[in-house]
């Protein structure tokens, strides 16, 4: 990486460092379709955290959270709903002018461990939008 490219990457990294609260999560099938709330509720609950050392974590939970009849003893149906109502992973990240790439070290879904999650993003002040903005977008607000 050239010194100029390294300076640009560092500038992008400095801008993204912090804790970001998930404000909305929307999907659609094509650019001509209307946006619909992602399956985690409207609004969903979650945080994306990016630190200065290049580590990050993402957690998203269904709103309202899945209830269970007997605390600490979910039925198989309740356990599946809990699993399907939560996304979490952590690892390291790199960033450039257009993408955040998250190298997943651990995740609620073991199939993601070892994967690289490449996410296009746009940053404007304290608002971060992650997604291609054609079929998906996750809007976050910087926590102060």
Name these PLM-found stretches:
Residues 1-144:
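Lipid interaction determinants
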């Amino acid at each position: 990486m050239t010194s100029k490219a390294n300076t640009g990457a560092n500038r992008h990294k400095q801008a993204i460092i912090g804790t970001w609260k998930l404000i909305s999560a929307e999907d659609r099938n094509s650019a001509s379709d209307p946006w619909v709330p992602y399956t985690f509720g409207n609004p969903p609950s979650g945080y994306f955290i990016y630190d200065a050392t290049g580590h990050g974590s993402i957690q998203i939970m269904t709103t309202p959270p899945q209830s269970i009849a007997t605390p600490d003893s979910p039925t198989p149906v309740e356990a599946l709903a809990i699993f399907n109502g939560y996304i979490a992973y952590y690892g390291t990240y790199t960033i450039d002018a257009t993408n955040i790439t998250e190298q997943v070290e651990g995740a609620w879904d073991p199939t993601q461990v070892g994967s690289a999650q490449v996410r296009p993003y746009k940053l404007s002040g304290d608002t971060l939008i992650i997604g291609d903005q054609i079929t998906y977008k996750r809007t976050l607000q910087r926590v102060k």
